[in-house]
Structure formats: C-alpha cells, structure tokens
C-alpha cells in the first residue's frame, strides 16, 4: 500500500514485520476464542465496537483452510450475537480491511438509531472521543467476557 515501501509491505504480509505477530498478541484482548482473539478498547469508534484478530498470521480469507475459515466464522457469529444482545444495536456492520496492518482481522460496528453515522459508513477518523461514560467500557468488557464464558 502507499504508506509502505514494497519491501516493508512484503515483510508485513509475510508476518516478519507484522506488529501483531511481533508482540505475540493484539492489544486490548477481551477473550481468546477458537480461531481469534476478541479485542476492544474504551477509545473505540462506537459503543460496543469489537475486533476479531486471527491467532495466526494470514492476510486474506483465502489463506485459511476450510476448517480455519469455519472456526473464524463461528467466532464471528458467536461474538456478533452476544454484542447485539448486550448493546441493543439495531444492526451490526462487519468490515475486513488489512491495508494498514495486513494481519487478518474483522471489525464489528454496532449501529444505533441516531448514531453519528446513521446514513452511511462509520468514519473512524472523525470519531476520536470515547463513546463510553465513566466505567461503561469496563462494564461492557466484563459482561462480554461473562456471556462468552456461558457458552
């Protein structure tokens, strides 16, 4: 991608320079699931935002075996249902990019009636303030962990 030189991009894609692989795990882990780490942050773009980060390095969905792809989708299905129930979101949006960090990860954006981006996609460059009030994120995190441990 334009941010990276060709050499840097190849090293990122191979996992050699992947910041997630180099640190061993992604930042903000809420839970470890079958194929992914579930992450979130109090500085998320939307209340209830989560990200599923593949445990092993892969860049594209086609890099996964059929079994890995099924496990990834099961993690996504499980988390998305729980996030929707916890947040009361009217819709969940799912995004896969990888042009900034080429390590397969899936963003989950709960959507709400009257949210700042109700008529379009979420612009994360505009949403810089935490969507959580005092202790709300920690409550969301604990509730999410508790619900995941029930299954």
Describe the function of each predicted region.
Residues 1-151:
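HIT superfamily nucleotide-processing domains
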């Amino acid at each position: 991608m334009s941010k990276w030189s060709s050499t840097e991009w190849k090293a990122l894609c191979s996992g050699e320079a992947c910041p997630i692989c180099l640190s061993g795990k992604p930042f903000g882990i809420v839970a470890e699931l079958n194929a992914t780490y579930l992450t979130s942050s109090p500085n998320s773009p939307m209340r209830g935002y989560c990200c599923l980060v593949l445990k092993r390095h892969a860049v594209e969905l086609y890099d996964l075996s059929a079994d890995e792809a099924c496990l990834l989708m099961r993690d996504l299905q499980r988390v998305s249902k729980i996030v929707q129930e916890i947040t009361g979101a009217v819709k969940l949006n799912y995004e896969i990019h990888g042009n900034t960090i080429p390590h397969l990860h899936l963003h989950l954006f709960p959507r709400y009636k009257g949210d700042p981006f109700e008529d379009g996609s979420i612009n994360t460059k505009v949403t810089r303030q935490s969507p959580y009030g005092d202790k709300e994120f920690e409550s969301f995190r604990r509730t999410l962990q508790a619900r995941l441990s029930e299954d």
